[in-house]
Amino acid sequence: MTSRPPSVDSLARSLAHIGLPHPLLVDAARQAIAAGNPDLAEHIANDIAQCLLVPVINAAGVIAHTNLGRSPVAHSQSARAQNLEFDLRTGQRGSRQAGIGQLVARACGAESAMVVNNNAAAVMLVLAALAHGRDVAVSRGESVEIGGGFRVPEVMEQSGARLLDVGTTNRTRLADYRKAIDKKSTDVALVLKVHPSNYRVEGFVEETLVDQLSTLGVTVVSDIGSGLLDAACPWLSDGPPSWLNGEPAAKQTLAAGADLVTFSGDKLMGGPQSGFIVGRRDLVDACAAHPLARALRPAA
């Protein structure tokens, strides 16, 4: 005599100890019964539970391991309406960029600043606003891949800019950039310098620094990655720690001659996931006016 399978409801209730919401337990029960093996229900429910977010201890820190979430942020702001995009002085529409932009620009010694939802978005917005349909010179040694398989050439392609490879993987000189810019077949809108934060080339190497690039007569954009605001770390009584040696900082990169600097706000800055564009006011304004800026703006 063939035994009847348990009801979906009774099987789902027997899985309550797993701690999933009841509708998910019902789904697991239905899948197991449909497969002809009710005993599979607990295995299916446990698989679902493994997909949920749980608290962990990130002993490596957000700089070394962002896959365990960004910096913990204590939300103490009361839940109430705020003047997010409203100018209380004029009674007119305001900008959500105004407050944070002024603060970050001041910290970096920049004319202006804006925030988007991550650093890849910051780079893409800069390229779309300033180099769409034109060439962007990048050293072959800086055409990097960041986490999740996202690559600089692919971000550039989506922006509508054209990648112009310069130099070699291990050695790129100022003369290489100048040669690429001076070619009659190229239309270089800007030079993009990318800090290779997740790898290092050592040995027979040569790098062109920002102060050298600033002599080329084209816009220089530097993506410094992790978001060190000031190499002097004036907020630390003992000065910058030794492990920051070699890490580019926004303030010093701008002082060296970069027109724009992009970086993350969720690593060294310790904020929520975000990306910043800082530098010349006219260039930041051009980025802010681009249609992509609204799509890439951070949530309220």
Indicate where each model-derived feature is located.
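Glycine-rich phosphate/diphosphate-binding loops and the adjacent beta-loop-alpha structural elements
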Residues: 30, 34, 62, 268
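Conserved PLP-enzyme active-site core in the AAT-like
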Residues: 92-300
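Short glycine-rich or small-residue beta-strand-to-loop segments that form or flank ligand, phosphate
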Residues: 63-67, 85-87, 137-139, 262
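Glycine-rich, N-terminal phosphate-binding loop and its surrounding beta-alpha-beta segment
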Residues: 37-73
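Short Gly/Ser/Thr- and Asp/Glu-enriched loop/turn motifs at secondary-structure junctions
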Residues: 5-6, 57-61, 270-272
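Short secondary-structure transition/capping motifs
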Residues: 53, 65-70, 89-93, 112-115
